[in-house]
Swiss-Prot record:
Protein name per the record: Peroxisome proliferator-activated receptor gamma
Cystine crosslinks: none
Subcellular location: Nucleus; Cytoplasm
Main location: nucleus
InterPro entries referenced in this protein's UniProt entry, alphabetically: 1Cnucl_rcpt (IPR003074), NHR-like_dom_sf (IPR035500), Nucl_hrmn_rcpt_lig-bd (IPR000536), Nuclear_hormone_rcpt_NR1 (IPR050234), Nuclear_hrmn_rcpt (IPR001723), PPAR-gamma (IPR003077), PPARgamma_N (IPR022590), Znf_hrmn_rcpt (IPR001628)
Motif annotated as 9aaTAD, chain positions: 495-503
Gene: PPARG
Keywords assigned by UniProt, alphabetized: Activator, Biological rhythms, Cytoplasm, DNA-binding, Isopeptide bond, Metal-binding, Nucleus, Phosphoprotein, Receptor, Transcription, Transcription regulation, Ubl conjugation, Zinc, Zinc-finger
Residue range(s) of DNA binding per entry: 136-210
NR C4-type zinc finger locations on the chain: 139-159, 176-198
Biological role: Nuclear receptor that binds peroxisome proliferators such as hypolipidemic drugs and fatty acids. Once activated by a ligand, the nuclear receptor binds to DNA specific PPAR response elements (PPRE) and modulates the transcription of its target genes, such as acyl-CoA oxidase. It therefore controls the peroxisomal beta-oxidation pathway of fatty acids. Key regulator of adipocyte differentiation and glucose homeostasis. ARF6 acts as a key regulator of the tissue-specific adipocyte P2 (aP2) enhancer.
Length: 505
């Protein structure tokens, strides 16, 4: 008997090993004993040729879980076995006309919010100016969000305008001795006390500096905010250091981050726009435009396009599992867990993470494929024959809602770590250390969201609810896979995905 997934974690320096897939009982799908190297001991994954997937020794053998469709998403149909090549000039002309209808879909999403200054969160997007709007700087007069450095202090637009009008028009307000409290909702009730508050906090007509906060002033204020937080809770410095570590690991593990994907979708990148696939003709043209890393949808003309693309998605899924496992190894405490528990956490967590990160590649109109080289429209995916046309719609519905939370990569880095360290997975041997790690991650996530999204007080609770939503998406995906298992006799599942599905639930 060959080694198991657990053996893969024992010696990270050893060579990739072979896993023996034994014949199953008569109640299950019969499988020929096949040795297939697919999960190296460094917790990565070596590639498997597509030809191996055609071997029916790897036919569907799944428990209730899900295959994955990461960034090379697609499952087209149209009963198409080989396609004749269209005339390139005619095809290009038709594509350009049709593209005008779809090009706007790539630029409708707002850019993902920028990261915090390194002074505050210990990490930031390289060479990118952090936005004042995300710094949680309050107006010194009323406590509303400051829009900048106005008349010598950080002030909101309302108080800036009020002070300017008072000074320019030389307004004199009726005296009030009540020392009224000035805050966002009451600032217009007593103009005298509001003006006195402006003067008290240091607003002056001699300091007529408008607009953005000077960099030195900004860094000073951010350092003060960070220091205040650390004094209130000494553990927060450790939590922010953990957030920085996870973010750094995330950037190293996942080549196509949300920031990069959003730049492509919003047209903010200097690279050429992705090739839009909206029908079968444009899919054929994509053969020449897109550099497919593993498999082109048209490389095997003897198979239906839907099946060929589905197999390509499986290759991307294997890559995604490799990226996630490498990231998991960098979560503090993960590699010290029981070896079997490490495997269990990954088996159950990878798909939920894949769908989380898939949302970064989506907008309401389509999804980026092939590392951002292509953009496949939602309508095209929905038009595919059943059951393939049903696969992606739940993911789009989730993505639209999830993207509305406006998380950035620094938020996602902690969130996916929380998903991995879920102590309620079936079959765990030692739950306590897993829950201890997750508790620490949850504290880091809560602090991160307070710093990065000060205006969204319920964001932490909303994000935890998404973990439940992800499990439901996985369940629905499995139900579709069970349909394919029965109806698509030519379909096969990648051996690594078989190993992940085996003995789940």
């Amino acid at each position: 008997m060959g080694e198991t997934l657990g053996d893969a974690l024992i010696d990270p320096e050893s060579e990739p090993f072979a896993v023996t897939v034994s014949a199953r009982t008569s109640q299950e799908i019969t499988m020929v004993d096949t040795e297939m190297p697919f999960w190296p001991t460094n917790f990565g994954i070596s590639s498997v040729d597509l030809s191996m997937m055609d071997d029916h020794s790897h036919a569907f053998d799944i428990k209730p879980f899900t295959t994955v469709d990461f960034s090379s998403i697609s499952t087209p149909h149209y009963e198409d076995i080989p396609f004749p090549r269209a005339d390139p000039m005619v095809a290009d002309y038709k594509y350009d006309l049709k593209l005008q209808e779809y090009q706007s879909a790539i630029k409708v999403e707002p850019v993902s919010p920028p990261y915090y200054s390194e002074k505050t969160q210990l990490y930031s997007k390289p060479h990118e100016e952090p936005s004042n709007s995300l710094m949680a700087i309050e107006c010194r007069v009323c406590g509303d969000k400051a829009s900048g450095f106005h008349y010598g202090v950080h002030a909101c637009e309302g108080c800036k305008g009020f002070f300017r009008r008072t000074i320019r028009l030389k307004l004199i307000y009726d005296r009030c001795d009540l020392n009224c409290r000035i805050h966002k909702k009451s600032r217009n009730k007593c103009q005298y006390c509001r003006f006195q508050k402006c003067l008290a906090v240091g607003m002056s007509h001699n300091a007529i500096r408008f607009g953005r906060m000077p960099q030195a002033e900004k860094e000073k204020l951010l350092a003060e905010i960070s220091s205040d937080i650390d004094q209130l809770n000494p553990e927060s410095a450790d939590l922010r250091a953990l957030a920085k570590h996870l973010y750094d690991s995330y950037i190293k593990s996942f080549p196509l981050t949300k920031a990069k994907a959003r730049a492509i979708l919003t047209g903010k990148t200097t690279d050429k726009s992705p090739f839009v696939i909206y029908d079968m003709n444009s899919l054929m043209m994509g053969e020449d435009k897109i550099k497919f890393k593993h498999i082109s949808p048209l490389q095997e003309p003897s198979k239906e396009v839907a099946i060929r693309i589905f197999q390509g998605c499986q290759f991307r899924s294997v890559e995604a599992v490799q990226e996630i496992t490498e990231y998991a190894k960098n979560i503090p405490g993960f590699v010290n867990l029981d070896l079997n528990d490490q495997v269990t956490l990954l088996k159950y967590g990878v798909h939920e993470i894949i769908y989380t990160m898939l949302a970064s590649l989506m907008n309401k109109d389509g999804v980026l494929i092939s590392e951002g080289q292509g953009f496949m429209t939602r309508e095209f995916l929905k038009s595919l024959r059943k059951p393939f046309g049903d696969f992606m719609e739940p993911k789009f519905e989730f993505a639209v809602k999830f993207n509305a939370l406006e998380l950035d990569d620094s938020d996602l880095a902690i969130f996916i770590a929380v998903i991995i360290l879920s102590g309620d997975r079936p079959g765990l041997l030692n739950v306590k250390p897993i829950e201890d790690i997750q508790d620490n991650l949850l504290q880091a996530l809560e602090l991160q969201l307070k710093l990065n999204h000060p205006e969204s007080s319920q964001l932490f609770a909303k994000l935890l609810q998404k973990m439940t939503d992800l499990r439901q998406i996985v369940t629905e995906h499995v139900q579709l896979l069970q349909v394919i298992k029965k109806t698509e006799t030519d379909m096969s599942l990648h051996p690594l995905l078989q190993e992940i599905y085996k003995d789940l639930y």
